[in-house]
Amino acid sequence: MSRPTVVLVHGAWADGTSWGPVITDLHQAGIPVIAAPIPLTTLDDDVDAVKRTIDRTEGPVVLAGHAYAGGVIGATSHPRIKALVYVVALAPDEGETVADVFYRDPPHPQAPELKPDDNGWIWLPHNAFPEAFAQHATADDHALLAAVQRPINVPCIQKPVPRPGWKEIPTWFLIAEEDRMINPDTQRFMAERIGARTHTHTVDPAPLISRPEVVTAILSEAVQSVATT
């Protein structure tokens, strides 16, 4: 079996650069890695974008998603996906929407108010990056995140998902104890429900930026598991 490739999927208000530190770590470890750019237009569009990225790879795939992208990776069906890694991510069950699980528990007091603009796109206020999205990251990180953020279209979070891959595929979950975007209680509920190999850390909602070594360690564990299966 060829060495697994890690396919990384960014969440809302981000692009592939959000995985930059993790990509560097994986590359230095000799683990093949590629980031999937998703349009954040509809759930189906995002799933199709991930499938196109997987088609560019060879061999088994460890598919990882951050935040909103948990809904995307669970809905992505591809014969070469051998592991799913939820990085502080949402994991709706069949018939649920991303919004259903996101709003399952009360929001953090510093969580931003999320509402669409006149065209149906949801943007993150710039002050939310240092206050809630990545409070442990640097000021330079916050400036970059705000500058490159990509809005998410409302239909992405309103469509019920199909039978998710986590029902059949080995799954890992990183819980962020200091998350101000997705309630940690919601994360614990999802991790238990999907039967994930769970890692809990005192990190913010964006550890792929603020604590990439934590994320890399979990991805490496998944890669090793697939490689020895």
Where are the regions that the model predicts?
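Conserved alpha/beta-hydrolase catalytic His-Asp/Glu region
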Residues: 119-165
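Active-site catalytic motif of lipid deacylating hydrolases and related acyltransferases
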Residues: 2-59
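Short, proline-enriched alpha-helix->beta-strand connector loops that line the catalytic pocket
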Residues: 4, 166-171, 194-196
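Flexible "cap/lid" loop of the alpha/beta hydrolase fold
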Residues: 80-126, 153-160, 190
